[in-house]
């Protein structure tokens, strides 16, 4: 009994201090990686969080999530050019655009499952890529892309990289906190039940379509949020933000960290970015070695890095309980 109580206490301590630990972790790697790269890491972690809500918690694999990242990136850029250079209003516009694309595409996409769900997302991403690259190149800048310009605000000068890093880190904590509350709610329990056995959930009287649709909208909105923050950091957008061939990046990160876990999303995002950045600096064909790393994770650590860590503590607890 004492061992179980101790384990629960440790778990509650982790849950209480998870956000300070995340902040401390990024502050630790900041002097090692530099401010630009650390900011990139934080933005990518937000994107992985958004993807994992669909894949890890609801069991729907998407090959087209770059579409929703790109939606936020282009929305914030177009807003800053044609409407207002207020950065907060531009980010808000990106959130609205992300939610809107989820509302429009959701009824079509969430009716599908398995490979069909993955491929229909990819198909829409291909369409979006064509639209920004060719069809609407007059407005999007085509292959050259376009720049975003933001006005200075009190205490929020995005021309200062330190301010950008602090703002992005705050946004990461905000996204994590929101999704943590969402997944811990009865709604979050229900979407995990849909992943395990949707037929049984329907039999209990729930309209699973509405729950899947709302979850999809949340995922697209948070993805657009990450895209908007990328433009705040980089200052320009190109079709690479919506390139379907980059879809595997967020999938790799989710698998490495551990799907179905918000902690795993952040760990996976950091590990993937660290590996890809390090290998790209020293090895010409770095993608091949990244593939080998993923194979090791899939076959050796099936639950990802976070699942492996929690598994070690679980086995230790069970050993002490004997």
Specify the residue positions occupied by each region the protein language model found:
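Transmembrane alpha-helices and adjacent helix-loop boundaries
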Residues: 1-322
């Amino acid at each position: 009994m004492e061992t179980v109580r101790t384990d629960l206490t440790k778990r509650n301590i982790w849950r209480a201090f998870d956000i300070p630990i995340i902040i401390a972790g990024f502050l630790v790697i900041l002097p090692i990686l530099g401010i630009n790269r650390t900011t990139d890491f934080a933005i990518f972690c937000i994107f992985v969080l958004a993807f994992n809500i669909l894949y890890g918690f609801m069991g729907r694999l998407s090959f087209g999530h770059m579409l929703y990242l790109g939606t936020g990136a282009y929305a914030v850029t177009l807003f800053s050019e044609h409407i207002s250079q207020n950065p907060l209003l531009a980010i808000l516009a990106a959130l609205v655009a992300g939610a809107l694309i989820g509302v429009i595409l959701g009824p079509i996409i969430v009716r599908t499952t398995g490979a069909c769900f993955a491929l229909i997302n990819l198909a829409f991403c291909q369409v979006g890529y064509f639209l920004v690259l060719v069809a609407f190149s007059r407005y999007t800048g085509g292959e050259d892309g376009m720049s975003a310009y933001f006005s200075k605000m009190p205490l929020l000068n995005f021309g200062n990289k330190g301010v950008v890093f602090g703002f992005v880190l705050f946004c990461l904590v905000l996204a994590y906190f929101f999704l943590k509350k969402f997944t811990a709610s009865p709604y979050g329990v229900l979407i995990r039940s849909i992943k395990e056995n949707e037929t049984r959930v329907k039999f209990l009287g729930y309209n699973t379509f509405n729950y899947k649709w709302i979850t999809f909208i949340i995922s697209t909105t948070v993805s657009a949020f990450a895209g908007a923050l990328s433009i705040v950091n980089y200052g320009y957008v190109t079709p690479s933000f919506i390139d379907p061939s980059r879809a595997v990046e967020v999938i790799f990160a989710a698998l490495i960290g551990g799907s179905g876990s918000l902690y795993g999303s952040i760990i996976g995002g950091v590990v993937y970015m660290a590996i890809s950045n390090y290998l790209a600096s020293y090895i010409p064909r770095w993608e091949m070695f990244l593939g080998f790393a993923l194979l090791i994770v899939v076959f050796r650590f099936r639950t990802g890095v976070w699942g492996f860590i929690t598994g070690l503590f679980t086995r230790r607890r069970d050993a002490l309980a004997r």
